[in-house]
């Protein structure tokens, strides 16, 4: 039977991505890759570790994607493109930094984040597992109340930590974070996988930068 990519996408979005609910690794292909504007590429294990560390749904238990416009790609029938306009209220203590950094747990402020419209896509295997997830591509930075930031960075802005969102845009800072995750504390969220740890299919389409 042909895969209903719209139904599959709607299911994964709300039950498996690690942003709105805990990660469900069983719905991700072994050759899974995640890509966002400043985060990624992340392979399956690094993505699971990162989202398990961030636990956005803990600090924002009512976070919802408010997704719309689910469309099967006419050229790639196993790909679904859609948009989100997420909302969520910061009502619970949140530690997105890593379990060894419990002292940095952020206390809730009761503010509701209204994120701008973001474009996402999911590409599946014929068996119905997600092979490629793209996320957080903001359509208009003048929407919402998170200073134009989307995805996790928007939640930092809403938590009165806009400086964290700004710092995360710095490639050098992300590189330091990756070194810490690799060498000091594996619970720290990675922003990119080591090139050699990415699936062959992804390395073929986006080769690592020359050293």
Where do the language-model regions lie?
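C-terminal and inter-domain tail/linker signature
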Residues: 1-211
């Amino acid at each position: 039977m042909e895969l209903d990519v719209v139904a599959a996408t709607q299911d994964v979005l709300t039950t498996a991505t690690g942003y709105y609910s805990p990660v469900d690794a069983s719905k991700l292909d072994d050759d899974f890759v995640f890509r966002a504007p400043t985060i990624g590429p992340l392979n399956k294990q690094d993505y699971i570790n990162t989202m398990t560390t961030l636990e956005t749904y803990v600090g924002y238990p009512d976070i919802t994607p408010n997704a719309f416009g689910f469309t099967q790609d006419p050229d790639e029938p196993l790909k679904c493109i859609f948009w989100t306009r997420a909302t969520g209220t910061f009502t619970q203590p949140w530690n997105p930094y890593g379990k060894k950094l419990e002292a940095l747990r952020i206390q809730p402020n009761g503010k509701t984040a209204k994120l701008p419209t973001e474009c996402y896509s999911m590409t599946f295997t014929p068996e119905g597992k997600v092979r490629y997830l793209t996320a957080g591509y903001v359509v208009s930075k003048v929407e919402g109340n998170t200073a134009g930031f989307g995805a996790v960075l928007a939640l930092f802005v809403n938590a009165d930590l806009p400086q964290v969102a700004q710092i995360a845009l710095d490639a050098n800072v992300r590189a330091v974070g990756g070194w810490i995750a690799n060498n000091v504390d594996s619970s720290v969220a990675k922003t990119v996988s080591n090139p050699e740890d990415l699936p062959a299919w992804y390395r073929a389409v986006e080769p690592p930068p020359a050293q």
